[in-house]
Amino acid sequence: MEAALSLRGLLVLGVLLGVFAFGCDFSSRREPSEASGATINKRPVAIAHRTFELAAPPADMPPLSSGENAQCDSNFVSNASVRGETRQTDATHATVTITRIKVTLGLNINIWVPTDATQRVIEHEDGHRQISEYYYQTADKLAERIAASYMGKRVEITGTDLAVESSKMLQQMAREITDEYNRELNPEPTQLLYDGITDHGRNEANVKDAVAHAIKNVAVESTQPSSNPGN
């Protein structure tokens, strides 16, 4: 039995790195509003179970790697919206203070199995789902910590059009927030360790035990050098 690595390359963590919103309150002198702060919007996990014919997989299904016949496609979504208040010092210089950050999180899981999939294959892919959901459980705490590190930050900007420069800076900061979230979340090593324990669903390893072992031991076992590099 064979099962796909659930990550589809890099778990599609970066799929929305470039999707963000930003805002700018541009004024010469203005105190932060009472509504200032960081807000995390964590959406419920969305799960879809899909079946397909191995000989004719649907167009919207991610391609299977060689030797695979199923996969759990986990898409972690992160969108950041950053707002700041600008204090202009002269015609071409200003200081932007970050006053509000909103981060929206999501996890979309599509489990793809062939119509003739065995129960072991189905259970193996569900193990990948469990790992993804484990990491998503505390994703809001991670996003909150990252957003908090940007709140109140002051950034100097220069240019002939300070409104444009402020928007560019806020846009870049939104990117940085989602980049950091995706980098720190990173369930990929755990998913890879799980596949190693179960041989992609081909051995008799208990799924529940394999998931628990991968989560508990990933920090140690994922850093050990492979005895067969490149395999």
Residue ranges, per PLM feature:
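Bacterial N-terminal signal peptides
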Residues: 12-20
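Short alpha-helix carrying the canonical HExxH Zn2+-binding catalytic motif
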Residues: 118-127
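Bacterial N-terminal signal peptides that target proteins for export
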Residues: 2-11
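Active-site scaffold of zinc-dependent metalloenzymes
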Residues: 92-119
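Bacterial Sec-dependent signal peptides at the C-terminal "C-region" and cleavage site
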Residues: 20-34
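Metalloprotease/metallohydrolase-associated module, dominated by Zn2+-dependent proteases
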Residues: 38-97, 103, 150-231
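Catalytic Zn2+-binding segment of zinc metalloproteases
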Residues: 126-142
